Structure formats: structure tokens, C-alpha cells
């Protein structure tokens, strides 16, 4: 048990927030703090609730219930605000929450050991323990704040106690089976599958003198169901009310659970074909019936597969298929459910099958007498098995979630087979930062498959189109997939194969598929250094509005020996002069020089003003000229929306006394190069009641995400704006 917990605990410190962790932690913690289950939508709150227990004693944690996302029950945005934007120590919170999941994992290991001893024998118990403590899928999910491990534990416990009831008809066993079935349903909506397992086991398990009769089996299903309902009702604070898909006069216990169970089923059906998934080299919006069969073949350790197969063959040979149906029925049922092609996004959905496969494999220890009758042979066999398991899992440690067996080939081939949570779940930002530091990489262009904030882990980056965090915005639309700008790129395996999981973006990163990574972060993020031969010429087209991946390469001026550094504009209110070519405003008699350098990100060269004065009610029209500097725009955490904007204010002396203001920026930073000049047209509406006199014009640069302004040096001091001139308001 200590070996298992150590592997999970040690590797947990090396992992950033995986894709779903922030959702479950936010929902569970908010439930504990407020008793409100409004965030328990896509999943019931039990898993997150258990994980959040270690956080209750921490009075420094801020729960932002005053944010609009809480009022709107928006778990996606609220979890972002909670973890990354409320001043909370996100990684520390996650590590403490993961302790509880690891504790559940240890309980699962112990349960498998004792179940094997009870069902099969002492030798089987020890073999099951050996197989379990080095099972990479169980180790991986025993240190993520998600629903998969709790669901696996509770389904296993429910099935085990149900088997005990069928073999030794004691009503408390049926009651316990029902309680654990209720916990499985409280952990995840598909926990309802446990009832199919229990019902089929009751039908197949032979009746014995000491076991439950047919009549008792039927009655016990009702008892177990009532126990499960009691668990769910307790979890939802004994609430009673109507649901939308039934008559309003019919109240139900735990209506929130029932309603969202129904909504989730409808949503899964509606989402079929709505996003692109990946399987065996094919990115498609269709599903594959054999997805989980292949996934099991490459994601489970070969020894585990081999022993499970031998175990099943021996069950058939010994005519024990019905007597020990509990060993093979749950995996078979889960695989058949997977063949319905409902959800092809990760082998983790088969995690509840693994404990039963381990029992099936462990049964071999009781059925091969020549191996177990002599202590010396037993010791040698155990030693060889242990060595095999240790060496196998050591190949990927501490990256257990990315485990593939030897059938999958070297790690470079794994993303050709499966991606998403099979390999890449957003968990390797810590590794990415360390790889960047080790290789002296200052910043990367990042295509990240995950919901964590890369900035929170010290990753310096510019966002590329990615599911789900970076799906839109000018920086995303400005990505040139045909000849990306030179520099370092960090591409998640899922993004490499599926883009942003929409049909039109599947090949966003096709150019990188034929390149060998310079380095990797874990097994999920690949680093490439992109450079072009010195003889390559550069086209510098200007594109307004259209996402670059929707345009053919020829439209961007790309040819075999010519790449494109595209200047992307959101509207026609701005103009770009690539490398300053064609910029002649300084020769205009109305040009007013400024030369204010904002942190070497942008320099305000000056502006033109063709209006000598303006009257109240009129619009003052200016054109500002900015030149791109050597430094990138600082990125706050998390990156959401525009990275940069500029302001122009008309003020009456004090900068806080604004009479008119302009805040906007049209150009994407991606594709801009040092020396590019951007001409931005500015319109300032002067109100009717403005008194005639001279007013100051101020300009500056800021981040719309955290409202931080860049500073500029003036007369030996630094300011977050520059006075560019004055405007005369006349009667």
C-alpha cells in the first residue's frame, strides 16, 4: 500500500492541473462551503466534495461567490476564477485535494487484495496486490481530482459485496452493496451502470444452498435500490421537487440529481459528431466501435492482459465461468457499452473494469499447481513478475497517465494511436517550464490542450489556437499554419492531431507532424524549434478579419521558397506598414512626434491631427503611429481575450478627469515583427457640455486582461501614459 501511495504522491507533485480537475474541485469545495450544488451539473458533487475536505480548514481560500459566474451556475468560468484569478494558491490546493483521491486509491488496492483472497485464495490475493500496486492507470487516476477513481472504487465495492450476498445470503451484504452503488451514482452519472452489473451477476451466479434464492435476489435488488436512493438523497440534503421532463405535480427526491442525470444523457446524445476525436491516425467527428478494444490493448500492461486472458481460459476449462462471472462480466459489459460509440475520448472511461481484470489475472495463481506447489518456484515466479512490473512502469514514471505498453511502439508513436486523456490531459505544464529552463528557452508558442493557466506555472508563452482555453480572438485567428513564424513551439499531442477539435482546424499543426521534437514535456507536450533557410524569402501580406487557416497558402503569398509573416487586422480602422515600408506620415505637416517607448513593446512615434480645433458635440479624429519593439507583451494569468490595447484620453489637467476616451487595438501581435508600424485611427467624441478651452491628450498601452499599463520614461521619471499634445475646444 505504501509503495502505491508513494508512486501516486510523488508523481502528483510533478503534475499541473489536469483538464477536469478544476471543475470538480470548484464544485466540491463550493458545496462544502455553501451547501449549494449549483455547480454539480455535468457530474454529481461527491468526488469533488471528498477531494475538497482537506481544504476546509484553510481560512485563506477565497470562494468568489460574488462573481457573475456563480450566479449563472457557470462551472467552467467559475472554476477559472476560483483557481487562477482569486489569489488562491491553486497548485497547493490541488495537491492537498489529491491526497484524498490517493487515499481512495489505497482503499481500492486493499479492497482488491482482500476480495481476491476471499473469492479466489491466498496466493491470488498476493498476486492481485502485486499487479495492482504497479498498475499505471490506477496510479495515475489516484492522484487526479476527477470522478474516475472514486467511481472505480465504489463500483468495485458494490459488486464485491453483492457477490458476497449472492454466495452468503446475509441481508447486510445486500444493504452494503446498495450503499456503495449509491456512492458510485453520486460520484458520476454513469455510475448507474452498476445496476446492470448487479442485475446480470444475479442472473448468472449459480444458486447455492448458502446463497440467495431467486426470490431473495429479486427482493434484494429493491433493498439495494432503496439504500442507493437514500445515499443520493442524503448527498443532496434531502431536497424534494419537480423536474422539467416530468409533470410538475410529481415531486422527486434529489431533483437536482435527477434533472442533471437526464440533461447529461441528452447532452451526450446531442454531442455525437459535434467535435473531432482521434483514433489510429484518423481525426474524425464520427466514433469507432473498436476504440476501447484497441485502447485496452495498448493502455493496459501486457502482463495484466496476458494473465487476464489465461485466467479466463482457465475459468472456461474448469467450468467456473458462471460461478466466477463477477470477474469477467463487468469488463465485458463496459467494453460492450464502449462499442456503442457514445464517448471515444479516453481509456479512463474503462477504469472500473481494471480491478476485475486484475482479479481475473490473479486467479491464475490458484489454477497453475506446478508453479505454486514448490516454494522455490513460487519465489522465482513472484520475483520475475515483480521485476517485469517495476521495469515496465518505470519506463513512464512519473507520467503514469501517459502509459502505453510495448505493443504501441516507442513514445514517438503514441500520439499516432490515441490522444486526449489517454496521453495528454493538460498535466505537464510543470514539466514544460522545467524543460524550457533546462534548454534556455525564454518563451514558446503554446498549443495547450487543457484548462490550467500556463502562466500560473511560470510558463512564458504566446497562445496558439487550442481547445478549450484558446478558441477565438485576434491572436488565435492570426496563426499562420502553413509557415509559422520562426521560434520555439510547444504543441500538445492532442492539438497536434486534432487542432481545436473542429473539422476545419484538424490540420492546424500539420507542419509539425513531420518534424522530430527537439524535446518533450512528459509525454504530452512536444517542443519544436522552427527555423527557415537563410535563402527563404518573406512575404508580408495584410489580412483583415479572416482566420488565416481558412485561406489557401497562395492567398498569403506562400511559395516553395517563400514564407509569410502575416499582419492580421480585426477591422479596417488600422493599417500596417511591414518593416516600416511605405510609412511616410513623418513628412506630413500635421505630424506631431512623440517618441514614447512603452517597455520596448511599442513605441508611439507620433500622431497626425488634421483638425486645428473641435467644437462640443463634434468628433476629434486622430491617427496614432506605433512601432513594434523587441519585447513581447506581458501575459497575465490566465490569458483570456485580447492581449493588448491602447487608450487615448482627453483630460482636464488631472488624468482622472476624462472628458473623452478611446480604447481599442486592431492588430494581432502574432505576425508582427520589430520595426513594423501600425497606424491606428482614433475617434474621440466631445460631449455637448464640454466647456471651451484647451485640454490635454494622453495616450498609453495596457492589458485588457488585468488592466496593467506599460510604463514609459519621461524627464527622468516613469509614467503609465504620455502627454502627446493638446486639443482646443472652441465655442
Which role fits each region the language model picked out?
Residues 37-100, 243-285:
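Interfacial juxtamembrane loops and adjacent helix segments
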Residues 1, 225-230, 313-332, 359, ...:
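Signature aromatic-anchored transmembrane alpha helix within multi-pass, membrane-resident enzymes
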Residues 128-133, 160, 181, 185:
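Short helix- or helix-capping micro-motifs
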Residues 129, 166-182, 214, 330-331:
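Short hydrophobic alpha-helices at membrane interfaces in multi-pass membrane enzymes
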Residues 117-119, 158-174:
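Membrane-interface transmembrane helices that cradle and orient dolichyl/undecaprenyl
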Residues 179, 307-310, 319-339, 383, ...:
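Transmembrane alpha-helix segments characteristic
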Residues 405-731:
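C-terminal luminal/periplasmic domains and tails of membrane-associated envelope-modifying transferases
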Residues 295, 300-321, 477:
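Hydrophobic, aromatic-rich transmembrane alpha-helices
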